[in-house]
């Protein structure tokens, strides 16, 4: 996917959750902000603690009254998180580029190729792993956002213990199994 198509796609995808929330939201007095490609909305970088890939926060929880949090995981390398469950939110995955992502949502086994997306419902255990040889890129949308943004803030710190069950519990999730790949 070329850079122009990717950027257009990201802009279109990020508009979808707002259309859903529009009827419920109060108009903001804040100016509209554009988040450039390969940048983070907060202005400082985040890392996926297990794989050290980039996590770019694109839409912050506070911008949508806790309804939506959107993060782009770019420069993905082989691996992924432990099997876990979210008590409070759905998680939508949109695989943008790279090799493949293998997933399990509940008992269903899934393979995502670039352009594919899937929704993991709340309270359904899920796990994923990137298996491409070239760096990959995937967009995650969480709704409602709950405490997920602070989870990513905390786990992107250099000394963070990613597999800490207490950290997951404190953010409305539970580890229920190992990662698909070590």
List PLM regions with ranges.
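Ligand-binding loop in jelly-roll beta-barrel domains
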Residues: 122-149
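N-terminal secretory signal peptides and thylakoid transit peptides that target proteins
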Residues: 1-17
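A short glycine-rich, His/Asp/Glu-containing loop-to-beta-strand
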Residues: 47-83, 89-90
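Short acidic-glycine-tyrosine-enriched beta hairpin
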Residues: 107-122
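C-terminal segment of N-terminal export signals and the immediately downstream linker at the start
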Residues: 21-55, 157
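Acidic/histidine-enriched, glycine/proline-rich intrinsically disordered or flexible terminal extensions
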Residues: 149, 153-182
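Glycine- and acidic-residue-biased ligand/ion/polar-headgroup-sensing regions
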Residues: 90-101
């Amino acid at each position: 996917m070329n850079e122009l198509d990717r950027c257009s796609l990201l802009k279109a995808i990020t508009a979808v959750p707002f259309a859903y929330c529009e009827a419920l939201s109060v108009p903001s007095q804040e100016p509209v902000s554009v988040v450039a490609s390969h940048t983070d909305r907060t202005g400082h970088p985040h890392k996926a603690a297990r794989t050290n890939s980039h996590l770019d926060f694109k839409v912050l929880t506070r911008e949508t009254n806790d309804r939506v949090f959107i993060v782009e995981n770019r420069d993905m390398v082989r691996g992924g998180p432990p099997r876990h469950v979210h008590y409070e939110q759905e998680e939508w995955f949109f695989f943008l580029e790279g090799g493949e992502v293998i997933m399990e949502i509940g008992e269903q086994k899934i393979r995502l190729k670039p352009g594919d997306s899937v929704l993991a419902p709340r309270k359904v255990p899920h796990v994923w792993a990137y298996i491409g040889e070239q760096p990959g890129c995937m967009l995650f949308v969480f709704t409602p956002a709950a405490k997920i943004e602070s989870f990513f803030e905390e786990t992107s710190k250099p000394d963070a213990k990613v597999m800490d069950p207490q950290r997951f519990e404190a953010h409305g999730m539970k580890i229920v199994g190992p990662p698909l790949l070590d």
